[in-house]
Amino acid sequence: MSNINLATLDISEHPNLPTSSAVLFKAKDDKKLSFEKIASHVGRNEVATAAIFYGQAKASAEDIVRLAEVLGIDHGQLAFLLGGFPDRGKSVPFPPKDPLIYRLYEIVQNYGYAYKAVMNEKFGDGIMSAISFSTKVEKETDKDGNDWAVVTWRGKWLPYSRF
């Protein structure tokens, strides 16, 4: 028997998530599907797909069709649940309490000004978009057999306008 790690959701620990989250995660759990498998069927990146599950990304009409197919959810129900606009940024308390999410916050806390300085030197005065943005997570194993998480952020550079 293979060891499959699947992300699940205890909705009682996440009261700020939309109703769609419970429906999506239940179907994901029932079908024993990883975000990688679901994303492959939907035709999106696995982080973008997971963001839909957490109510942090907007699902397109095609995403809804494909999610309904792969998860076995009624299309009409899913279209109703995912038809609105995401209410981003409310899903976790701040600062985050989950250790992994806190470490991501800690990375920005510790290296944020260094990132900013290097980006300003490379691009000038501006910001990296989180709207024209993509991200991915990869697993890398070094020569000693240690696993490493490789997280890539790719955001369009937006220079500040002079006015």
UniProtKB/Swiss-Prot annotation:
Gene3D superfamilies: Cyanate lyase, C-terminal domain (3.30.1160.10), lambda repressor-like DNA-binding domains (1.10.260.40). Keywords: Lyase. It comes from the Eukaryota. Catalyzes the reaction of cyanate with bicarbonate to produce ammonia and carbon dioxide. Belongs to the cyanase family. HAMAP family: Cyanate_hydrat (MF_00535). This is Cyanate hydratase. It comes from Ajellomyces capsulatus (strain H143).
